[in-house]
Amino acid sequence: MTFNIIKLENWDRKEYFEHYFNQQTTYSITKEIDITLFKDMIKKKGYEIYPSLIYAIMEVVNKNKVFRTGINSENKLGYWDKLNPLYTVFNKQTEKFTNIWTESDNNFTSFYNNYKNDLFEYKDKEEMFPKKPIPENTIPISMIPWIDFSSFNLNIGNNSSFLLPIITIGKFYSENNKIYIPVALQLHHAVCDGYHASLFINEFQDIINKVDDWI
């Protein structure tokens, strides 16, 4: 996948990038997403919620260059043409998880089938990263289906150059005849401001609301 170099000296975000990158400022935001119609539609069609949420997340990420901006293995700043999800899968027997990546696809059915194939092949492997090699253009996604939460934060102290978003999903719950699911978004301020966090949340909710258009 193509990695497009950003020339920092000519970048309109240069001042902000240098300031927050040197400070190593990251932040997280958690928002309850209304999945009432989404969950009902997914159930009727016979799909699983987790991969359907992953698909919706990747639609937002791959639509917006800001969420694909990072530093590659050659320590170059730039953005990928496309990112793929690297998601956790829990093993009930070992009480551990594996991280599996699946190729992104704009077509939901194609992505879902690829997900199911990868899951079948790798979910029982007792490795943290069973599907190798892992491409650079992946984004971490995980789900904690046992609890709903109002806040969630990750700290990456040993990788100061990781700029991509990290998404964590919680347990869905019912309130006032609506079904919600918490979604935590971890961002690096060097590339993403509060506006971009709001952009992600709003576009994600919009895709969830329009599930009938893509499922």
Curated annotation (Swiss-Prot):
<comment type="function">
    <text>This enzyme is an effector of chloramphenicol resistance in bacteria.</text>
</comment>
<keyword id="KW-0614">Plasmid</keyword>
<comment type="subunit">
    <text>Homotrimer.</text>
</comment>
<dbReference type="InterPro" id="IPR018372">
    <property type="entry name" value="Chloramphenicol_AcTrfase_AS"/>
</dbReference>
<keyword id="KW-0046">Antibiotic resistance</keyword>
<dbReference type="InterPro" id="IPR023213">
    <property type="entry name" value="CAT-like_dom_sf"/>
</dbReference>
<protein>
    <recommendedName>
        <fullName>Chloramphenicol acetyltransferase</fullName>
        <ecNumber>2.3.1.28</ecNumber>
    </recommendedName>
</protein>
<dbReference type="InterPro" id="IPR001707">
    <property type="entry name" value="Cmp_AcTrfase"/>
</dbReference>
<dbReference type="GO" id="GO:0046677">
    <property type="term" value="P:response to antibiotic"/>
</dbReference>
<feature type="active site" description="Proton acceptor">
    <location>
        <position position="189"/>
    </location>
</feature>
<dbReference type="GO" id="GO:0008811">
    <property type="term" value="F:chloramphenicol O-acetyltransferase activity"/>
</dbReference>
<keyword id="KW-0808">Transferase</keyword>
<dbReference type="Pfam" id="PF00302">
    <property type="entry name" value="CAT"/>
</dbReference>
<comment type="similarity">
    <text>Belongs to the chloramphenicol acetyltransferase family.</text>
</comment>
<keyword id="KW-0012">Acyltransferase</keyword>
